[in-house]
Regions:
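Non-catalytic beta-sheet/beta-sandwich ligand-binding modules that flank or precede catalytic cores
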Residues: 22-301
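Bacterial N-terminal signal peptides that target proteins for export
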Residues: 1-9
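Bacterial N-terminal signal peptides
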Residues: 10-20
Length: 301
């Protein structure tokens, strides 16, 4: 059965993305409110039990370019960038910059100047929120991110208030933090990249039998910034059960390319039960050119 709540919210998100493509620009996806303005009484089923942050990745220190900062946040200035990944997709109507608190190594506390789901704004990706602001420096790094406001999951069943996670240091490379089977109604087979830096990733080929989404702690490319290709595709190892035997499957294609985010779709030509994803060290880098670590993630859904 299709998830009716998600289908409705997907229509809202799609409308938001279309507005961003028009006059509103990418800034239409961002929020710079310094205080929590979510009326939590409107979400009576939202519970804090089980709410988690999967990662917070200190990816860039004073290195988001002037133009990008202006387009995203409406303000100029070289800024820090830190993606925060939630255990569930988020209803962005409940998202304010003031919902986040960042503790630095010296004990001081700061908040982001703005937050946005971009560039991870394709269908099924609204669990990664990019914080932009001043989060210390390489000598005084952020240590913890905590949700201090009411951020509600897309299904309105979870409130992330109080969730916290340790920050991955600036010098560390990206790792896998989440994987899931993509529901068939979300596959978008044959979709071409829009060429935009948000919401425009490619779909898997028409012959795909199963799609697995993997989420990295931060955006990943080849060293130097080029998009991944067959080298990285062949490096992905999918552990799957076939007739009670664990086998290794290589994706025959990759999807969700061309949009500069932290997600890849592994396009499989088998329907075996996926158990785990593995990826070796040293093939991809974050925007700071830190190489990825050897990493694996177990499927939980």
């Amino acid at each position: 059965m299709k998830r009716s709540w998600r289908s409705g919210l997907t229509l809202v998100l799609t409308a938001t993305l279309l507005a961003a493509c028009g006059g509103g620009g990418i800034a239409a996806l961002s929020n710079s409110e310094s205080k929590d303005s979510t009326q939590i009484s409107s979400y009576p089923d939202a519970r804090t039990e089980g709410a988690e942050l999967l990662s917070a990745f200190y990816g860039l220190d004073d290195a988001i370019p002037f133009l990008a900062s202006y387009r995203i946040c409406g303000s100029l200035g070289n800024s820090d960038g830190m993606p925060v990944i939630f255990s569930e997709e988020v209803d962005i109507a409940t998202l304010q910059a003031g919902d986040f608190s960042v503790l630095l190594n010296d004990g001081s506390e700061v908040k982001p100047g703005c937050v946005t789901p971009a560039p991870a704004a394709d269908l099924g990706e609204i669990r990664t929120m990019l914080m932009i602001g001043d989060f210390g420096s390489i000598d005084n790094q952020p240590t913890t991110v905590e949700i201090t406001g009411n951020i509600v999951s897309m299904d309105h069943g979870t409130n992330f208030l109080g969730a916290k996670v340790d920050v991955t240091p600036l010098e560390d490379g990206p790792a896998l933090v989440h994987t899931e089977i993509v529901p068939e109604e979300d596959w978008e087979l044959g979709k071409e990249s829009s060429g935009l830096p948000f919401g425009g990733g490619t779909g898997c080929p028409a012959s795909t039998q199963q799609v697995v989404r993997v989420v990295w702690a931060g955006g990943v490319t080849k060293p130097g910034g080029d998009e991944v290709d067959n080298v990285e595709r062949e490096a992905y190892q999918v552990m799957a059960l076939a007739n009670d035997t664990l086998t290794t499957v290589t994706p025959f294609a990759l999807g969700d390319l061309g949009d500069g985010d932290n997600n890849h779709e592994l396009c499989l030509d088998v329907t075996s039960e996926v158990v785990r994803i593995e990826f070796p060290a040293g093939l991809m880098t974050d925007p700071r050119e830190d190489l990825n670590i050897a990493t694996s993630i177990t499927l939980t859904n």
